[in-house]
């Protein structure tokens, strides 16, 4: 049990980060009309958009994915990518999703992440899943 579900825009920054993690992962399609449904608990990784407020911070594709009740019931945590140029709002998508889905905001990283970010997320994800009840 260590699935990562992620969205990456055409910039591919989040995609490259997830690839470097080397964990089982499924990508939310760029096309909002393409439906993805997962059948096991997962941690969501998303980029943050916008320059400050909560409106527009979460990618539309991630919103559509989470609007599926089945998908929303299986989210266990969120990790956000962002840009420090946004100041206090960097990684805001993680805050929004964590609050709306009542899950922990586990980590945030900038753009494609650093080697330290990769190590921190790998370790954190492993520890997170070890703490989860096995019958979930």
Swiss-Prot record:
- Molecular-function annotations in GO: FMN binding
Coiled coil regions, renumbered to chain: none
The UniProt entry, under HAMAP family, shows:
NrdI
Function recorded in the entry:
Probably involved in ribonucleotide reductase function.
Q: State the protein's name.
A: Protein NrdI
The family line of this record is: Belongs to the NrdI family.
What biological-process GO terms show up in the record?
protein modification process
Gene that specifies this protein = nrdI
Q: Name one Pfam family in it.
A: Flavodoxin_NdrI
């Amino acid at each position: 049990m260590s699935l990562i579900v992620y969205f990456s825009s055409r910039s591919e920054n989040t995609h490259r980060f997830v690839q470097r993690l080397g964990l089982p992962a499924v990508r939310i399609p760029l096309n909002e009309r393409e439906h993805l449904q997962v059948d096991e608990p997962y941690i969501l990784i998303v980029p943050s958009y916008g320059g400050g407020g909560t409106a527009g911070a979460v990618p539309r594709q991630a919103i559509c994915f989470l609007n599926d009740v089945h998908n929303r019931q299986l989210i266990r945590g969120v990790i956000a990518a962002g840009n420090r140029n946004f100041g206090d709002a960097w990684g805001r998508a993680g805050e929004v999703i964590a609050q709306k889905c009542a899950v922990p905001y586990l980590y945030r990283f900038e753009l494609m992440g650093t080697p330290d970010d990769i190590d921190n997320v790998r370790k954190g994800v492993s520890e997170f899943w070890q703490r989860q009840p096995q019958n979930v």
